[in-house]
């Protein structure tokens, strides 16, 4: 082989190597995106399941068992949100409700929406492992439900946040939690 042919062979190897690296990088990005999408779908399901559980509870401790409240000042004050007594305390992993089978203590111990304030849960997924779930409950303005209310109202905003290392990451490579919000509304049809 003369020197001209050697340069062509070396050039072909350079082009082939560059092409191989680009294809590999593309495959890695595609599989990462696929895993992020799958983890996000699982996070959606986990968050919605928790939200459904919460919104199926009574609006407030004071409205349990069919008791009617006519004045929002009769509702639980924000500083009393969370578990009401030791019988409602989660005794799991350091106060974190943990289950591999979806049998969480909150389902039998909590009886109203604001019991979930500060609640933490770990949900098992066979493909991704543990998802961390946290809940925040707060009163909101009845006319503008995006605004917090410093007093008691007949509206409570429930936020469910799900975290997992496989969720989508921002430009700083930080995990972006999946968050859903909904309103619990005390119906005043009386």
Label the model's feature ranges.
Residues 3-48:
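Aliphatic-rich helix starts adjacent to a transmembrane/signal segment
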